[in-house]
């Protein structure tokens, strides 16, 4: 696999994380939280292709579907909560809505890296340095996540009171997309 092909794969696998992170960043987020979320996504995007390669397609598809359903429900729930808070409070942001604890970070990382699990099955059948591929995929996804969070934070400061509503709508949309 050429480096260009690997980079294209990495960018494609990072797009869910990018779009989700813009939605999260819209409500305002600290630098520390940006690092935590980006590192979580990075690690999951390294771990999942390796898991896909090691575990095999059948077991991975069962685990992957359950994690995708849980992750998508989490995103829809968070998005609905943000929309409700924006509606109820006239658009005032509540950063506590996007504070992720340990389990929340794990679910977030799993929900946006299911495609990387599937990619691991394919990479395992090719003549490719799997550790290098997983590392590149993880680094690109982590960088895309950080960029999305920073952009979302910037955009949220410009959009003002509608940022929470917009962020909630984005999260609901991504959650629904990940479900199907």
Curated annotation (Swiss-Prot):
Task: Report the domain of life of the source organism.
Answer: Bacteria
Recorded hits in InterPro entries, A to Z, give: Mntp/YtaF, Put_MntP
* GO molecular function list: manganese ion transmembrane transporter activity
Membrane topology note: Multi-pass membrane protein
Record flagged with keyword Manganese:
yes
Keywords on record: Cell membrane, Ion transport, Manganese, Membrane, Transmembrane, Transmembrane helix, Transport
Q: Does the keyword Manganese apply?
A: yes
What residue intervals traverse the membrane? Answer: 6-26, 34-54, 67-87, 102-122, 131-151, 160-180
One term under GO cellular component:
plasma membrane
Cellular localisation: Cell membrane
Query: Which family, according to UniProt?
Result: Belongs to the MntP (TC 9.B.29) family.
What's its job? Probably functions as a manganese efflux pump.
Q: What is this protein's name? A: Putative manganese efflux pump MntP
